[in-house]
Amino acid sequence: MLRGGPCGAHWRPALALALLGLATILGASPTSGQRWPVPYKRFSFRPKTDPYCQAKYTFCPTGSPIPVMKDNDVIEVLRLQAPIWEFKYGDLLGHFKLMHDAVGFRSTLTGKNYTIEWYELFQLGNCTFPHLRPDKSAPFWCNQGAACFFEGIDDKHWKENGTLSVVATISGNTFNKVAEWVKQDNETGIYYETWTVRAGPGQGAQTWFESYDCSNFVLRTYKKLAEFGTEFKKIETNYTKIFLYSGEPIYLGNETSIFGPKGNKTLALAIKKFYGPFRPYLSTKDFLMNFLKIFDTVIIHRQFYLFYNFEYWFLPMKPPFVKITYEETPLPTRHTTFTDL
């Protein structure tokens, strides 16, 4: 079990909100031939975590194996949504539409309920910003995300400040197929991505990078269910997205090409300087000073360094710079090539 100690690499939730707070206040050469949005990189296996990376809150403490359902079982699929860190702050972050998403299942044959969600192993701050360790030449990332499956649904957690609603009904056979997909998806999609990066807020604006977070997992799960023949109800489903807005991103390189022995020392210094203010703060004064540095870099000088697919990109930022949205993504349409047997 991973726990945060006084010297551990956990980040306080308030740090992760530093740039989100900026959003509430605000409301090289371009890469030629690049595919946009940049495809999320998948891996052949999930690597072991570094002991330096410590979680303040243990990941998936009540996790259990996914059971095999009887083919003739009738299972309700539930949409689960609640404010992030609701266990600590209640509905506070719900007022800013900062929501966490999950999927629930309810078996008719057994009467048992199950929850599956995808989230960070080491909390949001660690997945969004690195640590600048004196013993490492490059920024050090504690960034992994994974699926957590466990028996039971915390009705109070989801209903009190969020949503618990049935979106579809499937068979046990379909559940088993989705369970196999979840295992494969979990082993190949290993890291969390907070930001969705776009050219602008308008409809049809170019997307440069897609987020890979809890809501993305829910949407992928719904899509896979639709591929297996699931028919969803006609209800509105909204999700939180955190946007960065920039001109065409500029590819910079990976850790070796930038921070290695033959790397670009000037660029390496600029990247480390950028990430410096995002470190855990020690006092209110420290927090305010770092916030002003972030504002100066991102808003005044319009610079942002993004780490995506274990590679660094420069984002030439532009208005409105940062924005949190809570918008509808429709439930998928059933694929007619499959039947829900």
Swiss-Prot record:
One of its GO terms (molecular function) is bis(monoacylglycero)phosphate synthase activity. Belongs to the CLN5 family. Heart, kidney, liver, spleen, muscle and rectum (at protein level). The active site is at H100, C214. Residues 287-326 are annotated as: Membrane-anchoring. Its EC number is 2.3.1.-, 3.1.2.22. The chain crosses the membrane at residues 14-30. It comes from Mus musculus (Mouse). The record marks L26, G27 as: Cleavage. Glycans are attached at N113, N126, N161, N186, N238, N254, N264. N-glycosylated with both high mannose and complex type sugars. Glycosylation is important for proper folding and trafficking to the lysosomes. Can undergo proteolytic cleavage at the C-terminus, probably by a cysteine protease and may involve the removal of approximately 10-15 residues from the C-terminal end. The gene is Cln5. Residues 31-341 are lumenal. This is Bis(monoacylglycero)phosphate synthase CLN5. Residues 1-13 are cytoplasmic.
